[in-house]
């Protein structure tokens, strides 16, 4: 069986790329198709596969300014000839689901309907497309996105929150399979001795609202480490007072050490799932999170963290005060993390694909050869 995996772009190792790795473990001979591929920015495991980039790869400056090329993404994602493949799996938070599968069974693992065009154009770092140029093309991109969703045979959502967004924007049903967390790597320390600092971690983009976390810690004077890279890095450094270390990008080993030693993780995003929160919990680190989106599926108030109601510095400060009044036993913080394990993800994805393949074979009256 020939398998193609479509991924929006490859320019860093974030949550979507961790999902891609796990899917590739299930389909080790798959070919990856992507809008553009910045070599050396993803894991050696991903790099070891055959990777086909679109014609966007040849545009000068694409790695730095790709968000400004959003109106070109639909044409690029539709440009491949995939007739040789039996199964197409798209890993999509933008346009990957719009690939033309040309008769193959197409399953989309949807990280989110495209934020750029549906509900967060003012929150995401889109460069020049924030302004009139983007507003002019937005209705056309919304129409294309709905047409692209109709090409998908079956949707998988990464959370119940995204499942509802798929229903709202595309009128499609989806099965929920939460993203994979490496619970063999993200483990608690031998001695659970927390240090006197808080952690905020992830991609430093505006919709994740690191700014309100920094503002809260500017006001309450507690120590904060901000770990991650992205377009907001320098802005956050300018905002931060001396008690805040905006560290930038850290290795996975350093991130794990921070999870293992931080007093708590502060998570202010209205996130589709939020893998960072579960990684922290797996290391025994409780989470102080905005009570919306995927956090409602991973943080149980008073058990493995604290939820706050508004994305405002004052709400963060009040949540930290509540947090500090409570003890956080290690096993209580970790009690659900194994349900998000990499093994659980792969088992559920494999079962979903096999069931849909069997249904497809029955409809066609054909029997596909196993890989």
Regions found by a protein language model. Name each.
Residues 187-225:
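Conserved donor-binding/catalytic core segment of Leloir-type glycosyltransferases
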Residues 26-97:
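Active-site donor-binding segments of glycosyltransferases and PAPS-dependent sulfotransferases
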Residues 314, 325-367:
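A charged, aromatic-enriched C-terminal amphipathic alpha-helix characteristic of glycosyltransferases
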Residues 301-302, 306-312, 320-327:
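Conserved acidic donor-binding segment of nucleotide-sugar-dependent glycosyltransferases
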Residues 286-290, 299:
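Short hydrophobic beta-strand element within catalytic cores of glycosyltransferases
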Residues 234-254:
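Nucleotide-activated donor-binding/catalytic signature segment of Leloir-type glycosyltransferases, i.e.
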Residues 260-272, 285:
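Acidic donor-binding loop of glycosyltransferase active sites
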Residues 126-155, 163-164:
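Membrane-proximal helix-turn-helix segments that form the acceptor-binding/catalytic region
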């Amino acid at each position: 069986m020939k398998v193609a995996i479509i991924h929006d772009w490859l320019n860093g190792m974030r949550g979507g790329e961790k999902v891609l790795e796990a899917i590739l473990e299930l389909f080790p001979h798959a070919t990856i198709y992507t809008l553009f591929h910045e070599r050396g920015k993803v894991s050696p495991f991903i790099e070891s596969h055959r990777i086909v980039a679109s014609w966007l790869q040849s545009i000068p400056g694409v790695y730095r300014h790709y968000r400004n090329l959003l109106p070109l993404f639909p044409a690029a994602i539709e440009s491949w000839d995939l007739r040789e493949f039996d199964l197409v799996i798209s890993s999509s938070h933008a346009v990957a689901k719009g690939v033309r599968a040309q008769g193959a069974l197409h399953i989309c693992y949807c990280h989110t309907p495209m934020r750029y065009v549906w509900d967060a154009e003012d929150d995401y770092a889109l460069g020049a497309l924030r302004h009139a140029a983007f507003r002019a093309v937005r209705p056309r991109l919304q129409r294309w996105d709905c047409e692209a969703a109709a090409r998908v045979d079956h949707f998988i959502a990464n959370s119940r929150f995204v499942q509802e967004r798929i229903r709202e924007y595309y009128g499609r049903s989806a099965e929920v399979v939460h993203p994979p967390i490496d619970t063999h790597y993200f483990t608690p320390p031998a001695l659970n001795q927390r240090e006197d600092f808080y952690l905020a971690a992830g991609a430093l983009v505006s919709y994740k609202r690191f700014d309100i976390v920094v503002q809260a810690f500017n006001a309450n004077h507690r120590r904060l480490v901000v770990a991650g890279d992205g377009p907001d890095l320098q802005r956050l450094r300018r905002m931060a007072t001396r008690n805040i270390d905006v560290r930038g990008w850290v290795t996975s080993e350093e991130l794990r050490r921070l999870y293992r030693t931080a007093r708590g993780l502060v998570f202010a995003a209205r996130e589709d799932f939020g893998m960072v929160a579960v990684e922290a919990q797996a290391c025994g680190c409780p989470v102080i999170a905005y009570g919306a989106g995927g956090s409602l599926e991973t943080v149980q108030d008073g058990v493995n963290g604290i939820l706050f109601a508004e994305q405002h510095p004052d709400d963060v400060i009040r949540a930290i005060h509540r947090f500090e009044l409570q003890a956080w036993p290690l096993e209580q913080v970790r009690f659900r993390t194994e349900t998000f394990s990499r093994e659980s993800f792969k088992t559920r994805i494999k079962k979903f694909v096999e069931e849909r393949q069997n249904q497809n074979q029955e409809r066609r009256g054909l029997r596909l050869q196993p890989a």
